[in-house]
């Protein structure tokens, strides 16, 4: 997370105003950055670490070394295929794929290495795509605020399942193992679904507040931020989901900050 943030800061300084970017996605190894822009294109950039002396970041307790990142000023791919702005983006070295979703209701696949067009998916009702996630197992989920539904596909474009989200989703995150999808939004709950069928595996009740951000920790805990500034921490109580040893009954509101 820190590496991605640092890369974005460096990238932001020299390119954001020029390219008018909407969003970014970074590969798991941090070496490739994909960006979506208002002009309906996706650009793919190489990332490298700055060599030489390390900068140091001051904290309240100590100084920590920080490595900066350099994004090559010219993208090595400019990918086309959409008729409207890019709304969601995924890039993976392991799958050799760049997947982009758009307000035009399409999801377009390109190869990462060659930048070659592979296929397009269209939302079942043509709705603008709001979010997409893809697992390393080759499963893709599309979500639209217009129909409030999740749509599961294989990497080859085969439709597998559809399920209503039962409310507007602000966050969709994969578990570390890639087999489960955590969804949260206006209802204030975290709902965990199978990436094989979209079946609900577990439901975590919140505190009646809209959840605006969600992350899954390496220990497979959920950290959820609410609209009023609260931070909620959940352990994964289902043995099927739990991939690491966690303290029991860790299910509490940790802080409330504005």
How would you name each of these model-derived features?
Residues 30, 95, 138, 178, ...:
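Conserved loop/turn motif of beta-propeller repeat scaffolds
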Residues 4, 10-16, 54-59, 66-70, ...:
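Short C-terminal beta-strands that terminate individual repeats in beta-propeller domains
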Residues 50, 73, 115, 157-158, ...:
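Short coil/turn linkers that define WD40 beta-propeller blade boundaries
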Residues 51-67, 74, 203, 208-212, ...:
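Terminal intrinsically disordered, low-complexity extensions flanking WD-repeat/beta-propeller proteins
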Residues 36-39, 101-104, 144-147, 184-187, ...:
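Conserved strand-to-loop turn within each blade of WD40 beta-propeller repeats
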């Amino acid at each position: 997370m820190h590496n991605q943030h640092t890369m974005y800061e460096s990238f932001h300084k020299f390119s954001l105003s020029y390219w008018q970017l909407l969003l970014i996605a970074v590969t798991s190894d941090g070496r490739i950055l994909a960006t979506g822009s208002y002009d309906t294109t996706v650009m793919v950039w190489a990332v490298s670490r700055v060599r030489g002396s390390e900068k140091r970041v001051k904290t309240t307790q100590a100084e920590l070394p920080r490595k900066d990142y350099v994004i090559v000023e010219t993208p090595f791919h400019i990918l086309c295929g959409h008729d409207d702005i890019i709304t969601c983006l995924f890039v993976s070295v392991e799958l050799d794929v760049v997947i982009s979703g758009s307000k035009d209701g399409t999801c377009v696949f390109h190869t990462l290495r060659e930048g070659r067009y592979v296929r397009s998916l269209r939302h079942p009702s043509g709705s603008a795509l709001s979010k997409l996630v893809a697992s390393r197992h080759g499963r893709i989920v599309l979500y639209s605020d217009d129909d409030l539904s999740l749509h599961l596909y294989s990497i080859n474009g085969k439709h597998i399942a559809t399920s209503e989200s039962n409310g507007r989703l602000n966050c969709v995150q994969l578990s570390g193992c890639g087999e489960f999808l955590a969804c949260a939004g206006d209802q204030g709950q975290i709902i965990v679904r199978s990436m094989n069928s979209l079946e609900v595996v577990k439901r975590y009740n919140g505190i009646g507040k809209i959840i605006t951000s969600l992350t899954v920790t390496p220990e497979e805990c959920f950290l959820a931020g609410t609209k009023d500034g609260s931070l909620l921490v959940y352990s994964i109580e289902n043995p099927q989901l739990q991939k690491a040893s966690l303290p029991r009954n860790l299910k509490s509101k940790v802080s409330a900050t504005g």
